[in-house]
Amino acid sequence: MNNHSKRIDGGLLRGLSVWVKIFQGMQLEKQMSEIERETMDYDVVIVGAGPAGLSAAIRLKQLDSELDIVVLEKGSEVGAHILSGAVLDPSGLVRLFPDWKARNAPLTVPVKEDNFYVLGEAGQIRLPNALMPPLMNNHGNYIVSMGNVCRWLAEQAEALGVEIFAGMACSELVYGAQGELRGVVAGEFGKSGDGSISEAYEPGMELLGKYVFLSEGVRGSLSKQVIEKYDLAAGCDVPKFGLGMKEIWEVDPERHNEGEVTHSLGWPLGFKNSGGSFIYHLDNNQVYVGYIVDLNYRNPYLSPYMEFQRFKHHPKVAKLLKGGKRIAYGARAVTKGGAQSLPKVAFPGGALLGCSAGLVNLPRIK
């Protein structure tokens, strides 16, 4: 067979492959159009039981106790997908529950010491607090487990009559006749990687609402669809993201300083790549150790994970962790675009909440 024949055969095969994919797509579309799902109607459907979604549900119930509100959480329980040992400014919580202390909110470790360092490979320079912007002052804040805070918020929401369904991943959006968002498909199982339906397929159900709030967190799959469909990012800067890695350590009691908050920049990233670290001393000899690397680095060989490992070998950090035990770890994307990257949050039938809308106050690191 000559080269000309090979090219013809290759082109024929590619053409057949395209037609097969088109046919498969048509068959899949037909299958999906024939699926019948049960529906449940609410006044408000909220996707995501993070702090934004739960706070929205609570505030709506406080304003009108007759509203039917459901919160859908993909994790096995509320807080299962929350990855943030955080310093919490309680001002937002005060607006929801002025009596949060009497309600035993899990804010038990006030910030007692606030440090900021510029690191070199073998040493560090502490920046005086007086030189730091007021927004970075953590006086009056608390070191918390956001997972515990979300579980507590869920308890308060349920006490007000909010329905919370855990283990309910939302896979699809439901639109109304006028193009408005009407609801979501939740609890769908048994789709293969190419979208085809397996024998174990469960269609899930449609949860419909007069309003649908998306609080999925950073780069949520449904939020991205809504931003594109309604052109919510028109006129905005391109959003920026970082990769945040966090570990929980149990350290030697002699090295533990409950209430201490430390942030740093510099080594190992240097100043050509942006990012930095945090170390928060919780109670029970536990310490949150984390590192954030902005994902705009130009060096293709840079590994955020390895930069985090190098950071832990800095003399100051290694001394803290010596003899300690890592008890949990994880990583998560972080929105870092700033106000100029915020999309419009309202759209026909709903709104974006929290990190789905990029609502992170970077100067506050909150």
Regions found by a protein language model. Give the residues of each.
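FAD/FMN-dependent oxidoreductases across multiple families
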Residues: N273, N299, P304-K366
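N-terminal FAD cofactor-binding segment of flavoenzymes
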Residues: K74-G123
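N-terminal Rossmann-like FAD-binding beta1-loop-alpha1 element of flavoenzymes
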Residues: V44-V70
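Short, positively charged and aromatic/hydrophobic N-terminal segments
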Residues: L16, K21-Q27
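Conserved Rossmann-like nucleotide-cofactor binding loop
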Residues: A52, E77, R219
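A short, basic/flexible loop-to-alpha-helix module at the beginning of a structural domain
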Residues: M26-D41, G195-G204
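Short beta-strand to alpha-helix junction loop
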Residues: M136-E155, F165, R298-S303
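Predominantly flavin-linked oxidoreductase catalytic cores and closely associated redox partners
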Residues: Q156-K316
